[in-house]
């Protein structure tokens, strides 16, 4: 039962945070949002590795949902740096990479958890922090200041994502 709660809360936080992070990346650039999300995710995995109670793991999953919401920013980054004729292919590669990650991640987590239940969190923290360092040193900004827009809570409202569902309700 708790596994379902943990998964639902992660997805709910990602749903709420995705449009906010997207709007922040439109305002401040893709790079800072991606960097802060990777840093936050790395620190969050450390929190979960050290969590003394189930409650702390729950807090960690909430934070993880927010920081994982930067996927929209990653897709925006790819849209910024690829030509329109290569964009669909690039999005397909990203989708495949995420799919492979969702297959390999739990399997690797199971192997690592057999060694220690906290080891998967430490390894995930290492990957996230390595991604942060890579981005800090190598990742250029893809969204130039002249293309940035003001932050708008109206655009960042996650309820607005549900609006297209009205097409199916009569």
State where each predicted segment sits.
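Helix-loop-helix hairpin linking two adjacent transmembrane segments in secondary transporters
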Residues: 97-137
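Structural signature of the two symmetry-related core transmembrane helices
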Residues: 32-47
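Residue-level signature of mid-helix packing/kink "hotspots" within the transmembrane helices
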Residues: 11-19, 69, 102-103
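Juxtamembrane intracellular "pre-TM" segments in multi-pass secondary transporters
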Residues: 142-170
């Amino acid at each position: 039962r708790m596994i379902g709660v943990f998964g639902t809360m992660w997805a709910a936080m990602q749903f709420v945070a995705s449009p906010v992070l997207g709007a922040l990346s439109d305002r401040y650039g893709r790079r800072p949002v991606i960097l802060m999300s990777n840093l936050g995710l790395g620190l969050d995995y450390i929190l979960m590795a050290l969590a003394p109670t189930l409650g702390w793991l729950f807090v960690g999953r909430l934070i993880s949902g927010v920081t994982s919401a930067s996927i929209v920013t990653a897709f925006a980054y790819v849209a910024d740096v690829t030509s329109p004729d290569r964009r669909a292919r690039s999005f397909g590669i990203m989708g495949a990479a995420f799919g492979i990650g969702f297959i390999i991640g739990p399997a690797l987590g199971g192997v690592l958890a057999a060694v220690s239940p906290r080891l998967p969190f430490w390894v995930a923290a290492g990957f996230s922090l390595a991604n942060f360092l890579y981005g800090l040193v190598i990742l250029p900004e893809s969204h130039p200041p002249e293309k940035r827009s003001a932050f708008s809570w109206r655009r960042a409202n996650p309820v607005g994502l549900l609006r297209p569902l009205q097409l199916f309700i009569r």
